[in-house]
């Protein structure tokens, strides 16, 4: 709303002007230098970082000390902003997030602290962890990676966790229940032949007329290999029971490309330079920085620039982290062997 936007602009201006380049006195840590910066605002929330420094040395303040100072200054800033608002309007301190990952508008994750800097819980919004059309294995894998990043901030450990998860998937050790997706069947589809679980319900009805799922029933299905690449979704899914009875092959590549990959591309794309650093690919980092400068010079609209950057980073992450597993699945399906097999 217009009022919400005005409040965000007001809070941004107040905090950045008052704490933008200021030495502040704190209760437990004496004087600290603030370089407050607006991060994100939406409807009735606004996010800032204080970019804390030692006022004498200029050294950045991080970790637990930064968390404690931020909680104190954020409450102070909220009270200051409220003084100049007409009641009942107020700017209320809600939470401090450390670490904090902002993926896009209304999509973020972080360790949430309120007033106690020693009591934090993981908070996420708008992520695939909550989507009903996500299988449990995505939630397990994504959640495990986020847990590593939130608690240890170790990107290499997060990548190793991803690799182990992908290996477990393609080796067939993931329980089918973890790959199943459940959707409710309705009776009012405009184009029912394009609705995968409706087509599956029809197939079940033909196989067993007395047990055709009815509108309102929740249908559980798993994706299976179909050699026809143009096949519609209804011909790519089956019930877990039918898969076991007929020894069908689960389509693991679908779970990588359509379930795991997209949300994880976006997440790891934010750490692309760190990944290249671990792999000692300095040339890739130089090329990336050059490409980003060129992109920034050709696109003036910030939102469009961020979308193009995300697309660029996602493609690089696919190559770095996912392609070797997709190739392995393809080889197993076609009977091809890698050249290393001949020297094993």
Q: How does the language model describe each region?
A:
Residues 2-43, 48-344:
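DNA-dependent DNA polymerase catalytic subunits
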């Amino acid at each position: 709303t217009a009022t919400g936007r005005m409040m965000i602009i007001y809070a941004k201006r107040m905090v950045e002007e008052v704490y933008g380049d200021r030495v502040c006195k704190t209760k437990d840590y004496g004087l600290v230098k603030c370089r407050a910066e607006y991060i994100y605002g939406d409807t009735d929330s606004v996010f800032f970082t204080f970019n804390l420094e030692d006022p004498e040395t200029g050294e950045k303040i991080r970790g637990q000390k930064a968390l404690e100072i931020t909680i104190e200054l954020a409450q102070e800033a909220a009270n200051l902003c409220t003084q100049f608002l007409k009641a009942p309007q107020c700017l209320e301190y809600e939470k401090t997030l450390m670490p904090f990952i902002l993926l896009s508008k209304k999509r973020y994750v972080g360790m949430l602290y309120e007033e106690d800097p020693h009591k934090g819980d993981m908070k996420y919004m708008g992520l695939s962890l909550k989507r009903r059309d996500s299988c449990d294995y995505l939630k397990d894998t994504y959640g495990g990676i986020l847990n590593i990043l939130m608690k240890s901030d170790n990107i290499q450990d997060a990548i190793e966790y991803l690799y182990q998860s992908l290996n477990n998937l393609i080796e067939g050790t993931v329980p089918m229940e973890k790959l199943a997706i459940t959707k409710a069947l309705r009776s009012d589809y405009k184009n029912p032949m394009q609705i995968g679980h409706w087509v599956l319900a029809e197939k079940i009805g033909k196989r067993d007329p007395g047990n055709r799922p009815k509108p309102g029933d929740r249908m559980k299905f798993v994706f299976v290999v179909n050699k026809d690449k143009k096949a519609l979704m209804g011909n790519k899914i089956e019930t877990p029971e039918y898969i076991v009875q007929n020894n069908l092959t689960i389509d693991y590549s679908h779970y990588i490309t359509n379930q795991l990959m997209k949300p994880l591309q976006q997440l790891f794309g934010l750490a692309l330079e760190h990944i290249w650093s671990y792999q000692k690919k300095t040339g890739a980092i130089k090329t990336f920085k050059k490409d980003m400068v060129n992109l920034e010079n050709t696109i003036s609209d910030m939102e469009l620039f961020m979308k193009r950057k995300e697309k660029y980073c996602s493609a690089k992450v696919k190559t770095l982290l996912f392609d070797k597993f997709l190739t392995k699945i393809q080889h197993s399906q076609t009977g091809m062997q890698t050249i290393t097999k001949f020297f094993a």
